[in-house]
Amino acid sequence: MIDTTLPLTDIHRHLDGNIRPQTILELGRQYNISLPAQSLETLIPHVQVIANEPDLVSFLTKLDWGVKVLASLDACRRVAFENIEDAARNGLHYVELRFSPGYMAMAHQLPVSGVVEAVIDGVREGCRIFGVQAKLIGIMSRTFGEAACQQELEAFLALRDQITALDLAGDELGFPGSLFLSHFNRARDAGWHITVHAGEAAGPESIWQAIRELGAERIGHGVKAIEDRALMDFLAEQQIGIESCLTSNIQTSTVADLAAHPLKTFLEHGIRASINTDDPGVQGVDIIHEYTVAAPAAGLSREQIRQAQINGLEMAFLSAEEKRALREKVAAK
């Protein structure tokens, strides 16, 4: 189901949601951090979704063990590097990795700015070794409040040339986008792209707000757009992309099952929607699974899957020249 003549992308992928269980085990031992299990087999149920979680917030707690072992900046650098290695193993040509430095720093009071630097270093080294093209998206974790998001924003701005876009993630219901208007004004002033998690836990009004008030060019998840025909028309007309994450939306109980997922309808409506992983380490999936198992189960035809793959590159925060070069590089292989 993957067209090997086209670039394969993953543009909604959380770096801090893709920490290998083996790495959690090794870092726990290295830093003498008490873990809920002492073998890989017994640790996996604590760090990966085995059965669907009742809601988004419950799902997010599965990420916590991954960041609890980030006891040093070297550990942050390692997981960033391994994210690129994983992308290469999955056959990805281009990946946009998003991360919340405040979340990664929290367990061991690491300097937020240091975490940003460590992630940049790890990703840069991974790209050099594995040949994957990558860009970084800074996440503000809305769950921790406006002040914490401000701290994350300042850390990103200090290295603004290494950051491609700003995102807002976390508890969408408890912390609506209206709390973060000034943050996104500064992001746009910095020349960054904007993508926002919206329409996952909250309704279509959250998506409208992300677009109209925060300046979103893309929407993360966006499943609730299906409830608003005018919104779907607007997304299609304005070419505002939806970063779909099929398995994730089932595991968070955002959507009942794959057959009920709106991605197929979005594509039929002419919306620029793509296929992505979200938190592959926590979900126990990869991009290949999403294309070859999840997408067909969601009712997508072979041509719709190909269109979603094309959309992934068209939606990417790359220049027209960068997109052309990537297409030519893949076609020449």
Curated annotation (Swiss-Prot):
Site location (Important for catalytic activity): 221
Pfam family, one: A_deaminase
Comment on bound cofactor: Binds 1 zinc ion per subunit.
Catalytic residues in the record: 200
Binding site for substrate: 14, 16, 170, 279
Any GO CC annotation of this UniProt entry: cytosol
UniProt binding sites for Zn(2+): 12, 14, 197, 278
Gene3D superfamilies referenced in this protein's UniProt entry, alphabetically: Metal-dependent hydrolases (3.20.20.140)
Entry EC number(s): 3.5.4.4
Keywords of the record: Hydrolase, Metal-binding, Nucleotide metabolism, Zinc
Gene Ontology MF term list: 2'-deoxyadenosine deaminase activity; adenosine deaminase activity; zinc ion binding
A GO BP entry: adenosine catabolic process
Signal peptide positions on this chain: none
Catalytic activity line of the entry: adenosine + H2O + H(+) = inosine + NH4(+); 2'-deoxyadenosine + H2O + H(+) = 2'-deoxyinosine + NH4(+)
InterPro entries named in the record: A/AMP_deam_AS, A_deaminase, A_deaminase_dom, Ado/ade_deaminase, Metal_Hydrolase
Essential cofactor(s): Zn(2+)
HAMAP family, sorted: A_deaminase
Family: Belongs to the metallo-dependent hydrolases superfamily. Adenosine and AMP deaminases family. Adenosine deaminase subfamily.
Known function: Catalyzes the hydrolytic deamination of adenosine and 2-deoxyadenosine.
Protein name (record): Adenosine deaminase
Organism the protein comes from: Escherichia coli O127:H6 (strain E2348/69 / EPEC)
Gene that specifies this protein: add
